[in-house]
UniProtKB/Swiss-Prot annotation:
Protein known as: S-adenosylmethionine:tRNA ribosyltransferase-isomerase
Pathway as given in its UniProt record: tRNA modification; tRNA-queuosine biosynthesis
GO biological process terms, semicolon-separated: queuosine biosynthetic process; tRNA wobble guanine modification
Localization, UniProt: Cytoplasm
Domain of life: Bacteria
InterPro entries given in the database record: QueA, QueA_dom1, QueA_dom2, QueA_sf
Job of this protein: Transfers and isomerizes the ribose moiety from AdoMet to the 7-aminomethyl group of 7-deazaguanine (preQ1-tRNA) to give epoxyqueuosine (oQ-tRNA).
Gene: queA
Gene Ontology annotations for the cellular component aspect, listed alphabetically: cytoplasm
Key words, A-Z: Cytoplasm, Queuosine biosynthesis, S-adenosyl-L-methionine, Transferase
EC primary class: transferase
Species in which this protein is naturally found: Desulfitobacterium hafniense (strain Y51)
Catalysed reaction, written as an equation: 7-aminomethyl-7-carbaguanosine(34) in tRNA + S-adenosyl-L-methionine = epoxyqueuosine(34) in tRNA + adenine + L-methionine + 2 H(+)
GO molecular function (one): S-adenosylmethionine:tRNA ribosyltransferase-isomerase activity
Length: 341
């Protein structure tokens, strides 16, 4: 398969620059992946579209304000540091700009010395390992000094940091939001549970590799970034019970779907465990757990478009995207949603 097989023309005015209010007023395209039939709904109507017994699997990661601006120690040279992945208690894999300004052993000072970062190592892919020194609790220091790492295609300033968090976000560690979850409100979750829909939480800390362009012509040759996940034994048991009873398991977002497929055995059961996954899902992949997916509209030639194409078929997805563009759906992180069943 060629990379251009997943390309399409997206007008710039279809890229959502800010979220809609309230969260569940976003539009929802519903696709039957077996027939290709498409329905246009609103996200708050989700309880009408699901059945009692369905399981929604959500990713409860929390985005950290991962973009830090500091100065190289002893100079006034500005350094931008983007936290990507925690590798140890105080050691992070980061993206440093401009990278040439900082050599191993040198230090960046943030917030008048409230936080200091020492460059330990330059990794083969150009990312940097940095050890941080600080007083108090790292997350609190980060909240004080850091900015939300909004995707590069969002050029408007975010007024409310919480708007780039899901309402069920718990454990800090992501460099980007699991954006399919941004459409949920507390009231909508309550209505879903009243309907008999089961909500199961799992964790995957989203890395910025999500936004990295695929640079190979043959999609099979692409290598995915690695991300930390955790599925508790209780979550695994609830999902396995649903599968054994013939109930549908629907992932909220590509991160939840990748986590589920990472812990799935050939027997169609999952086990509770934690670790790192670099699972890469593209057409030809056979899903072991997923019966459906709620996701946003993704950018051309991305691994995310490949994943939804693996579930619903490339031709059907590209056709649905053309309809979405013509109908004025909003794309990307703050955009509208699609449910594939």
């Amino acid at each position: 398969m060629k990379l251009e097989d997943f390309d399409f023309e997206l007008p710039e005015d279809r890229i959502a620059q800010h979220p809609v209010e309230p969260r569940d007023s976003s539009r929802l395209m519903v696709m039957n992946r077996w027939t290709g039939e498409i329905e246009h709904r609103v996200f708050r109507e989700l309880p009408e579209l699901l059945q009692a017994g369905d399981v929604l699997v959500v990713n409860n990661t929390r985005v950290i304000p991962a973009r830090l601006i500091g100065e190289k120690e002893g100079t006034q040279a500005k350094i931008e540091c983007l936290l990507l992945t925690r590798r140890d208690k105080d050691v992070w894999e980061t993206l440093i700009k401009p990278g040439k300004r900082l050599k191993a052993g040198q230090t960046v000072v943030f917030g008048d010395g409230l936080l200091r970062g020492e460059l330990l190592e330059i990794l083969p892919d150009g990312n940097r390992l940095v050890r941080f020194n600080y007083q108090g609790i790292f997350e609190e220091v980060l909240d004080q000094l850091g900015n939300m790492p909004l995707p590069p295609y969002i050029t408007e300033q975010l007024q409310d940091k919480e708007r780039y968090q899901t309402i069920y976000a718990k454990e800090s560690g992501s460099a980007a939001a699991p954006t399919a979850g941004l459409h949920f409100t507390p009231e909508l979750l309550e209505r879903l549970q009243d309907k008999g829909v089961e909500i199961v939480e799992i964790l995957l800390h989203v890395g910025l590799g999500t936004f990295r362009p695929v640079k190979v012509e043959n999609v099979e040759e692409h290598t995915m970034h690695s991300e930390y996940y955790r599925v508790t034994p209780d979550a695994a048991e609830r999902i396995n019970r649903a599968k054994s009873q013939g109930r549908r398991v629907i992932a909220v977002g590509t991160t939840a779907s990748r986590t589920l497929e990472s812990v799935a055995g050939e027997n169609g059961r999952i086990e509770g465990k934690e670790g790192w996954t670099d699972i890469y899902i593209y057409p030809g992949y056979t899903f072991k757990i997923l019966d459906g997916l709620i996701t946003n509209f993704h950018f051309p030639k991305s691994t995310l478009v490949m994943l939804v194409s693996a579930l619903a078929g490339r031709d059907q997805i590209l056709k649905a995207y053309q309809i979405a563009i013509a109908e004025g759906y909003r794309f990307y992180s703050f955009g509208d949603a699609m449910m594939i069943l």
